[in-house]
Amino acid sequence: MRGYEATPLNQGISNQPRPSSRSKVLDLILAVGAKMAPNDCHKLVNAKFSVVSTRHEYARYSRQLILPEIGTEGQSALQNSSVSVVGCGATGSIVLDLLARTGVGELTVIDRDFVELTNLQRQVLFDEGDLDLPKALVASQKVRRANSDIVVHDIIKDLNLNNAEDILGHSDLIVDGTDNMETRFLVNDVCTKHEIPWVYCGAVGTHGMVMPIIPRATPCLRCFIPNIPPQGVLQTCDVAGVLNTIPPIIASIATTEAIRILLGKQATDTRLIIYDVWEQTLQKMNVVKDSSCRCCVESQFEFLDAKKGDKITTLCGRDAVQITPAREATIKLAELAGSLDRIGRVKHNEYTLLFKDPSTDFEMTLFRDGRAIIKGTRDPEAAKSIYARYVAR
């Protein structure tokens, strides 16, 4: 399927059980946990739910199958959908977990970062045993344990103009779990160009926002925010902080919007949903399509078409700069650790290398693909100098 056209697995099965059969369906729910011949249960389930072939599958999704908003065709559509979650932080990790438990058949999680102690206050998929491991890897392992019937891909990379179309192009829908507007504008370019629906969301302080975006049918992100605001204009997590009760709410709203799109039941109007958990207020704002939008009207994909080169990003919430080489490399972390060990303190695992030079205030985390996060500076030029000094180009 492409985005919001739900197609049932079996066209020969009626959309919903007739009212006269409703009691049989409810009886079936009770029968799942009862002593019942497996063959009889199998036949009864298949008679009513084309998407379910075993008692195990019916037991997993039974509470959704009886919802009129989802039903059998809806569950079939979810199981035949592919969703990518960009960013696996406070909101993205919860979105990923909810989509997995809902039964979305194929999930891809993309995240460039590793688990740090500061994440554990609000990023509920992670615990102390996950420290220093890639977020995408840990998250994919944990949601597979929640639902082993689905396919989950983890991509431990920075999403950028060099790889965004290859990574996201297969998706039926994309959910935003990022922490910066530059990546959101890049996702908006990809989705507009390839007509992929997506859900914009974010949380900071005590409030968060969600907006579903469907190319051609609704305004895009740049109709709402034409340009990336100058640094310091938007609130960020390092300045405003984050109350850990707001990301689960925003993630739940975003996941619900994603499910509605996958089922073809999205609202016809474009709403920006704003929720403040401290004040307990919910607002809905209508977003109007910009008739001169450079992205969705003029098809100028500036964030995809920018000059390709090393990407330098100042990271939200940390005194740090990320460097992503234009050409992906394969760094032999163990060998480099041996060399750097003579200079400073080194820790490494299969995925990352952490280096601290005692003569300076910076700390470098290096990934296998050549990407590095330089802590202790917000100056891109200083970060580039540190990278060039310690990492062979």
Where are these regions (language model features)?
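Intrinsic-disorder/low-complexity coil detector
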Residues: 7, 16-18, 37, 324
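Extreme N-terminal basic, low-complexity initiation segments
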Residues: 2-11
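Short hydrophobic targeting helices and cationic amphipathic motifs
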Residues: 11, 16, 26-30
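Cys/His-enriched low-complexity segments
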Residues: 13, 23, 37
